[in-house]
Amino acid sequence: MSRRHRTGGLRVAVPKQENSIHRFLTANGVFHDDDIQLDHMGLRVVSSESTAYANPPDAQLSLADLEAVRVLGKGAGGSVQLVRHKWTNDIYALKGIQMNINETVRKQIVQELKINQLTLHQCPYIVKCYHSFYHNGIISIVLEYMDRGSLADIIKQTKQIPEPYLAVISNQVLKGLNYLHQVRHIIHRDIKPSNLLINQKGEVKISDFGVSAVLISSMAQRDTFVGTYTYMSPERLGGQSYAYDSDIWSLGLTILECALGYFPYRPPGQEEGWNNFFMLMELVINQPPVAAPPDKFSPEFCSFIAACIQKRPGDRLSTADLLKHPFLQKYSEEEYHLSNLR
C-alpha cells in the first residue's frame, strides 16, 4: 500500500521504501547518484570545486507552488500531470517517478536528469526541463507542456500526416538532433513518434532522454543495447558499435511511419505490430531497407527517406546534410504551419 502526501494541491502517491533505494539517500533524505544531488529544493551538480543548485534559488519553483489540473498519462513507475503555477498561472507537465523501481529504470532517470541539465534552455527544438525535485520517495521533473501531444497522438487522429507538414516536422527535429549531436555529443537512442512532441504554436520538440548517451567527441561510438527496438538501426539490433547516425535511421522510420500511417516494417499477416523481436531483427538486418512508395510520394520525399534509412551507417546523411535536402526546401513553414495540421 502507498500513503499519500499533500503538497500544494498535488496529491502524490508515496511508495513504500525498498532497501535498494536506501543506498542513494543521505541521512537528510537527499537523493544522490554519481555527480548529482536532488532534494525538495531542486537539483545540484556536484564537482570537485563546488556544489551548487542548477538554478539560482530565487528562480526556483517548488512543488508547493504547483496545483494539479489533470493527469496526462500513467505508467508502471509513475505519472505525468498537467499542473498550474498558483501565482503566475503558467502551465507545466509534471513527471513523477516513484523510486521503488528497478536498477535499470533508476539509471535511466538519473541519465535523463543529467541530459536535461546539459540542454537546459539552450535549444528551442528540445523540450525544456525547468526544475527537478526529490521528496518523500518521488522524483518530480517540471517540464515544458506541449499541448498537442506527440506525433503518435497526431497519427491516431489524422491517420496520416501530409508530406508538406512532414517536411516542416523533419526540419525542426533535425535542428534538434544537430544540436544534440554536434554541440552536446549526445545520441538520443530513442527517436520515435511518441518522443517527438508538438504544441499549438507549431513547434516540434525532442523529449525523453532516459536512454540517451553522451559521447566524448563527434567521432565516438557506443555499443550498449537500450531504446525501443522497433526503431533501432541494423547495427544496433546486431549488437555492433553505433554512433549519431543511428538516430538518423530512427528518424527516417518515424517520418515514413507518419506518412504511411503505420510502422514501415509490418509483420507478415499482422497489422498490430511486432511481438517477435528476432523476426524483426532478421528482417531489418538481412533484408533490403524499407522505402517510401514512389507512386504515393514525391521524388524529394522518397529521396529524403532513402538518405535516412540506409543499412550501412556511413551511407546515411548527417543532420547538417539532411537540413539542406531538397525535400526540406520544397515546403515553407509559413505556408504549412503546423498549427494548421488537423
UniProtKB/Swiss-Prot annotation:
List the active-site residues: D190 (proton acceptor)
- InterPro entries, from UniProt? Kinase-like_dom_sf, Prot_kinase_dom, Protein_kinase_ATP_BS, Ser/Thr_kinase_AS
Positions contributing to ATP binding: L72, G73, K74, G75, A76, G77, G78, S79, V80, K95
| Keyword terms, alphabetized | ATP-binding, Kinase, Nucleotide-binding, Plant defense, Serine/threonine-protein kinase, Transferase
- Name the chemical reaction catalysed here: L-seryl-[protein] + ATP = O-phospho-L-seryl-[protein] + ADP + H(+); L-threonyl-[protein] + ATP = O-phospho-L-threonyl-[protein] + ADP + H(+); L-tyrosyl-[protein] + ATP = O-phospho-L-tyrosyl-[protein] + ADP + H(+)
Q: Which residues form the Protein kinase domain?
A: 66-328
Tell me a GO biological process for this protein: defense response
Task: Give the knockout phenotype.
Answer: No change in chitin-induced cell wall modification compared to wild-type. Modest reduction in chitin-induced MPK phosphorylation. The levels of mRNAs of the defense-related PAL4 and CHS are induced similarly to wild-type.
This entry's comment on induction and repression of expression is:
Slightly induced in response to chitosan.
Q: Which domain of life is it from?
A: Eukaryota
Q: What is its EC number?
A: 2.7.12.2
Name the Pfam families on file. Answer: Pkinase
Q: Name one GO molecular function term.
A: MAP kinase kinase activity
Quote a single Gene Ontology cellular component term. Answer: cytoplasm
Q: In which family does this protein belong, per the annotation?
A: Belongs to the protein kinase superfamily. STE Ser/Thr protein kinase family. MAP kinase kinase subfamily.
What is the stated purpose of this protein?
The CERK1, MEKK1a/b, MKK1a/b/c and MPK4a/b proteins are involved in pathogen defense. The pathway induces rapid growth inhibition, cell wall depositions and accumulation of defense-related transcripts. This protein is required for full defense response to fungal pathogen chitin.
Name recorded for this polypeptide: Mitogen-activated protein kinase kinase 1b
Q: Which organism is it from?
A: Physcomitrium patens
Name of encoding gene: MKK1b
